[in-house]
From Swiss-Prot:
Designated name of the protein: tRNA modification GTPase MnmE
TrmE-type G domain location: 211-364
GO CC entries: cytoplasm
Family: Belongs to the TRAFAC class TrmE-Era-EngA-EngB-Septin-like GTPase superfamily. TrmE GTPase family.
Gene for this chain: mnmE
Example GO BP: tRNA methylation
Binding partners and assembly: Homodimer. Heterotetramer of two MnmE and two MnmG subunits.
Native organism: Ehrlichia chaffeensis (strain ATCC CRL-10679 / Arkansas)
EC number: 3.6.-.-
One Pfam family here: MnmE_helical
Cell compartments where the protein resides: Cytoplasm
Entry binding sites for GTP: 221-226, 240-246, 265-268
Major location (coarse): cytoplasm
Amino acid sequence: MTTIFALCTPWGRSGVAVIRISGEDAAKAFVHFGINSSIKPRTATFTPLYDKDGEVIDEAIVVYFVAPNSFTGEDVVEFHTHGSFAVIKMILAELGKIFVPAGPGEFSLRAFLNNKVDLTRAEAIVDLINSETEMQAKQAIRQMSGVLEKLYQNWRQQLIDILSNIEAYIDFPEEVNSSAIANIDYLLNNLQKSLESHLNDDRRGERLRQGIYVTILGEPNSGKSTLFNHLAKRDIAIVSEYAGTTRDPLEAHIDVAGYPIIIIDTAGIRESTDPVEQEGIKRAKLKAENADFKIVMLPYEKRDIFNREIMSLIDDKSICILSKADNITDQKLIPVFDFSFIPISVYCNIGIENLLNLIKQKVEKDFQFCNTDPFITSERQRKHIQNTLNIIKSVDLSLPMEIVSEDLRLSVRELGKVVGVISDDDILDNVFGKFCIGK
């Protein structure tokens, strides 16, 4: 394979920039930059970098990793230089004379091809790079540790063991009896239950990776946009005394106790003859249906007026709040028509911490990490696991063992696609195409 290079840190002024080279000719960079000092593997060496005229480009820390003891499994050289636009441009220009620029995710792709990471760990690297909150990072790091790979490899090995028994029965049909068939059926049923339990996770891993949706609902002028802007810590929604100002749902990303929350401001819900407002209300209700959680608002001064349409939105996913409670002194929950409401006032900063704590409690209850069974974190993983389950469920042990064997061989192949034991170009393009250049 060609020797590749790329800037691994973002473009821009910084204290340090890291430029990585990977491939069998990586050490040629030492000669090209006039590095005379002995570069010991896995040791940080301070040295000047020279251009072809003998002029110093920069003073750098050079680290050399000899294959296979590197991230990619190949010889790797890293230049830790000053994060100057000029310095970076000069070094990359020099490297372009002897090496090939890396494509997006090409370093990680080589790590995969050299068996340094499986596909689930490669996906975790992308997720860690893209993580914006503590819990997103923790989920990615947990996956990078290999918990998903170990789980899927264990299931795959179970299928291989069952398949081996069936292949033996094909070669020695006299060994096939009711006890042997019952044992295979027992093993397949246990594996089926494990796969079903794993898939029945309410998509927690994907939702945590992408963001947890919390929709704000209420009648017009109940303070939805004011609360939305306060939580977002910037003015996104227009706040007006005129009802019906908000039409299209607005989104903002916030961090609540390390969880990625996407809050959504929506149109006020009421009876309306305005077709544009009706469409906004329709979209608000649709956002409510698809949300992970809902904040249902009633103005404090209207707490004794039963609003059937607003009350009908309350369910076990809801946090109920009484807005505009500016003069309240007791922040305890207030009963309103059999529901408990939190009094808040954005203007007086009353009850906001209580609201955030309730959001935290609800999110932690649904998204806390399980120590025994890790979450699926991508649609790609889910698809192959579901395909594996479908194949196992279709196995008919009353059919000839040759047919059963072929079905199980397909299931082994499908599970192998999750970790990359079996892969094709489309799968690799899908996974590594999400990386930035330099990773």
